[in-house]
Design a protein with these regions (language model features):
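Beta-propeller blade signature
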Residues: 1-3, 49-61, 113-129, 169-170
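Acidic, serine/threonine- and glycine-rich low-complexity intrinsically disordered segments
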Residues: 1-96, 102-104
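Short glycine-/acidic-enriched loop or helix-start segments at secondary-structure transitions
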Residues: 47, 109, 166
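Short, well-ordered strand-loop elements centered on a beta-strand within folded domains, enriched
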Residues: 62-65, 132-136, 167-169
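Loop/turn-rich, solvent-exposed surfaces of beta-rich toroidal or solenoidal domains
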Residues: 80-161
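Blade-level signature of beta-propeller repeat domains, shared across WD40, Kelch, NHL, RCC1
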Residues: 159-171
Length: 171
């Protein structure tokens, strides 16, 4: 095994801008062995590049032409705005993923976000198999606070996972 680049692959049909934010889990392999890549879409700053998710099927070396999930026009249950940036994500198993998304309708200046003050970041639960997104009922936050929010999300997820085990031990 080496770190040598063997080849470069492209997916142009969806308009998804390849590249990932440097925090959180930006690629993962699900239980089926398929690899998913979170794409930031130029951090939401250039509408030419969409944010979304691409997949490489197990045993393949190209992006799956049957799966590209553009999130810019995705309906988000519990949220009227649309996203321009899939910021961070964490795969939880069985097609469920928890993530943060930037929603421009919360920007004070509609043409330029202020990531120090705009509370435009929402937390979501995503189903990568059924392509659904649901807003979690947590407060919006600033993008620069997202690392703290991601830690909060993971602790909540851990509590959800451990709760059934705790209840099973109760008399």
């Amino acid at each position: 095994q080496t770190d040598k680049v063997e080849r470069v692959i492209y997916e142009k049909a969806s308009g998804i801008g390849i590249g990932a934010y440097t925090y959180g889990q930006q690629t993962f392999i699900d239980e089926k062995g398929d690899m998913y890549l979170m794409c930031t879409g130029a951090y939401g700053m250039n509408p030419k590049y969409k944010t979304g998710i691409l997949r490489i099927k197990k045993g393949e070396t190209e992006f799956d032409p049957t799966y590209n999930w553009v999130l810019n026009d995705q309906t988000i249950e519990g949220e009227s705005g649309k996203t321009v940036w899939l910021l961070q994500s964490q795969y939880a198993g069985n097609g469920k993923m928890y993530a943060t998304m930037d929603i421009p309708s919360y920007w004070a200046n509609p043409t330029s976000p202020n990531w120090f003050t705009d509370k435009s970041l929402i937390s979501v639960e995503m189903d990568i198999y059924n392509k659904t997104v649901k807003k979690l009922q947590w407060r919006n936050t600033r993008i620069l606070s997202c690392l703290l929010l991601m830690a909060e999300m993971m602790w909540a997820f851990i509590r959800i996972i451990l709760q059934p085990a705790k209840q099973a031990r109760m008399p």
